[in-house]
Swiss-Prot record:
Protein name: Methyl-CpG-binding domain-containing protein 1
Protein source organism: Arabidopsis thaliana (Mouse-ear cress)
Biased composition (Polar residues): 15-24
Zinc fingers typed CW-type, residue spans: 49-104
Pfam families listed in its UniProt record: MBD (PF01429), zf-CW (PF07496)
Record InterPro entries: DNA-bd_dom_sf, Methyl_CpG_DNA-bd, Znf_CW
Region of interest (Disordered), residue spans: 1-46
Amino acid sequence: MLPFPAMNLKKSRSENSSVASSGSKIEEQTEKSAEPTTIKVQKKAGTPGRSIDVFAVQCEKCMKWRKIDTQDEYEDIRSRVQEDPFFCKTKEGVSCEDVGDLNYDSSRTWVIDKPGLPRTPRGFKRSLILRKDYSKMDAYYITPTGKKLKSRNEIAAFIDANQDYKYALLGDFNFTVPKVMEETVPSGILSDRTPKPSRKVTID
């Protein structure tokens, strides 16, 4: 079984208090987990969504989750995990005999990333934001100049206008987003998302 890249989100305090035994869901942060990696999401003041602040990868052999220190390292593992599987021993001083760094449970909100996605071009940053209703994540790229780009058309236009970044290949910008694992979403959020039955008026 291929290990998946994933992300983890924590809950805000208010969410923690409203969701029983939700553990570390959004607690102002969220951790990730996925097949090869996991990500943690943190709610930032003034930000309408939640962003990832923890990355993790699952060992191909023992299936334990290992935290990944940086987004760059995480993206490197994710980009080649299909040809070069991740094992606990990949991390210096770690083996399958050691206790896992994270447990896949509802104490955190997990999002599963897609293996094989390309690394973000040098100088740019890929950002993921979790929607307030936890339905999905949105992806965008931040340029070296601090501009936020939300589509490949915007990226192409930026590179055309800024030839210093022509080294960045358009194919290395990917807007595929991780899958939010619904069983790890706070129950209070799920109930809020449940559509209410419509009231039909019958006219005799």
